[in-house]
Amino acid sequence: MRYEAIGFDLLTALLDSWSLFADVAGGRERGMRWHAASQSLLRGKPYRPFEDVIREGAGVVGIERSKAEELLGRWGEAAPWPNVPDVLPRLNSYTRFIVTNCSERLGAVAAASAGTFDLVMTAERAGAYKPDPRPYRAALDALTLHRKRVLFVAGSAHDVGGASRAGMDVYWANRGRVPAPTDATAIREEEDLRGLLDMLEG
């Protein structure tokens, strides 16, 4: 077996957090602008509480504070993408872990919606937000895994770069069909997780 462990991004690779943002914001376009604003506030920035980032991101795009509190209260409602419940049980022979930009509390709530994992490494615990390599490395250290024996399932282009810089091979579930990053290359790119099984079994 080439890999002994598989890591996952949580909020894009496993869960459809975009639809939750859209539902709370009152529309897909508004929700995606909120999501993007929140991402821009944490990416490459010093760590600060994730909940504050969500609140500030709402303000950036003109969404009222009460909506941010509603989103945080409904965090556990983010549902797995349709193929996730079929794929994850077939990976039980691997150590499975998550690396997420969530806080400890929100990470635990959201991960429970996705499945069962050996570790949920949050940005709060690592003291840095992805794509900084520290959260990925913290997960590897916590599970005493060698990076070359781990495949990471990225949810975003930034995740591809972050996980690659931490030394892992990357499978990219490019659900948004966005352009490939310029700083790293996934060993396989698909629109969902179905290609993951083919790759591991091939």
Stretches with model-predicted labels:
Residues 35, 76, 89-92, 201:
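Alpha-helix boundary recognition
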Residues 24-27, 49, 64, 92, ...:
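Serine/threonine-rich low-complexity intrinsically disordered regions
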